[in-house]
Amino acid sequence: QVQGQLHTAQTFGLDYVNTMSDPAREAADCGAVVEYFDEQPVAIVEDRALLADKTHLARLKIPDPLGGGRMHNSIKALALFQEQIGREKIIEGWVEGPIAEAADLRGINTLMTDFYDDPAFVRDLFSFIVEMELRFAREQVNAGADVIGIGDAAASLVGPDLYEEFVWPLEKQLVDGIHAL
C-alpha cells in the first residue's frame, strides 16, 4: 500500500498520501467477519454481523490499535510514510465515523431499525465506537499522520432529526477529540 501510494503521488504530482484502503479495518479487529476479493476492497459479511445479537456489545472489547491486526497495519504504513517522505507530502490517517462503523458491526438494515426500537443501544454503540476511533486516531498521529480523515457516509441515510439526535453529537465528539490530539 505504501509503495503504491508513493508511486501514484510521484507520478501525478500529488502532495498527499493516505492509508484508507477499506472501511472494514476496525470492525475486523473487533472480530467481525470480513471477505477479501481480488478486484474490490475488503467488505463486511453483513449476514454474519458481529453484533447481530446486540447483547454482545456489553462484552465487546476495544481492540488495541498496536495489537497486530488490521489497524496496526495502517499504523505501520503511516510510520513507513513518515520514514520515507517525512514532511514532503501530507500524510493522512483514517477512522470510521460512528454510524458507518455501527453499520459494519451491527448491519446497516438492523441499525436503522435500532434507532426506533432501541435508541439506548444505539447511543451505547456509538459511544463505544467513538472511544475506539479516538484510540486508533491517537496511534495514527503518533505514527506520523498529519491529518485524520473520517468516513461516515452512512450518516446520509438518516433524516435530519435522527442525525441531530444521534449522529451529530458523536461526530462532533470524534472531531473534537481528534483536534485535541
Segments predicted by a language model, with ranges:
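An N-terminal domain-start capping segment
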Residues: 1-5, 53-63, 98-99, 105
